[in-house]
A protein has these predicted regions:
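Short, Lys/Arg-rich N-terminal segment immediately upstream of the first membrane anchor
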Residues: 1-3
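Exported/periplasmic ABC-transporter solute-binding proteins
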Residues: 5-9, 16-18, 23-299
């Protein structure tokens, strides 16, 4: 009887192990993992496509991406409510200090390159602006296109909301930290600005190149540092990557500490397989040297 009992127990154990193995096989062999990510609206479409493609290759790992602006994503990372923040600007020192005080060491990854596009209505005859002229438009110095060699038509400036990384980058780079004109129309996202410019002959706005390149009904202006300097388009990939285009910038992902496990796989994938997708969405892939530097942060 004792031998029969032992045999019966052994059979039960074998069937149990087999059942567990079968369940693991059916489920992909790994426990489902969810990565939460939030931040830049400029990067929202890019990050959503990255998340979808990554999940296609790593079925057990899901990445939930939402927008709200770079500042919103960074705040969420500091509070520990997301695993990753996408940002179209670098973290400010005050934000880094807040993170460290909260016990979080933010790690920065450059993941793509953007050239902020200055867009106007297709009927606007202006083709080129200098950085000073652009600053004058957004600080309220210029209020009519005729002052810039254009038509006698009021200028309507469109920009982003204050939580946007692009809002802050533009204020630092173009306005030299001056205030925006109080007449600027603050819009919720890049698509809203594109739509506004399509319907406003006097309008001017700034959007990520990933949005401008795919839009119709708008014109993308060339920019120059000053009047004697050459002007460049954000559609000129070499000019953006080399920094000749004056509004070139990196796009970032931030993690709380050096990523491990599934999060490390996600960052590794973005810096390798994800780079061609950045080009497909309309942004620019990182140069090889920059990729090597970012990959070293995962070692």
């Amino acid at each position: 009887m004792e031998r029969k009992a032992l045999v019966a127990i052994s059979v039960v154990l074998i069937l149990a192990v087999a059942g567990i193995a079968a369940a693991l096989f059916i489920g992909g062999g790994e426990k489902p993992i969810t990565i939460n990510q939030k931040g830049s609206d400029t990067m929202l479409e890019l990050c959503q496509v990255w998340a979808e493609e990554f999940h296609g290759e790593y079925e057990s790992i899901s990445v939930i991406v939402s927008g709200g602006g770079s500042g919103t994503g960074i705040t969420a990372l500091i509070s520990g409510t997301v695993d990753v923040a996408q940002a179209s600007r670098q973290m400010k020192q005050s934000e880094i200090d807040q993170a460290i005080a909260a016990g979080i060491t933010p790690v920065e990854f450059r993941v793509a390159i953007d050239g902020i596009a200055i867009i106007v209505h297709t009927s606007n005859p202006i083709e080129v602006l200098t950085l000073d002229q652009l600053r004058g438009i957004y600080n309220g110095t210029y209020v009519n296109w005729k002052d810039l060699g254009g038509l006698d038509m009021p200028i309507v400036a469109y920009g982003r909301q204050s939580t946007s990384g692009t809002y802050m980058y533009f204020q630092e780079t173009v306005l030299k930290n001056e205030n925006y004109t109080t007449n600027m129309q603050q819009m919720a996202g890049n698509s809203a600005i594109v739509q506004a410019i399509m319907n406003d002959e006097g309008g001017i706005g700034y959007v990520g190149i990933g949005y401008a390149a795919k839009a119709s009904g708008i014109k993308i202006l060339n920019l120059s540092k000053d009047m004697p300097s050459l002007s460049y388009s954000p559609l000129d990939k070499d000019a953006v990557i080399d920094g000749d285009y004056v509004l070139s910038r990196y796009l970032y992902l931030y993690t709380a500490g050096t990523p491990t496990g599934a999060l490390r796989e996600y960052l590794l994938w973005i810096l390798t397989d994800g780079q061609p997708i950045a080009e497909e969405i309309g942004f620019y892939a990182l140069p090889d040297q920059i990729i090597e530097e970012e990959l070293e942060k995962l070692e």
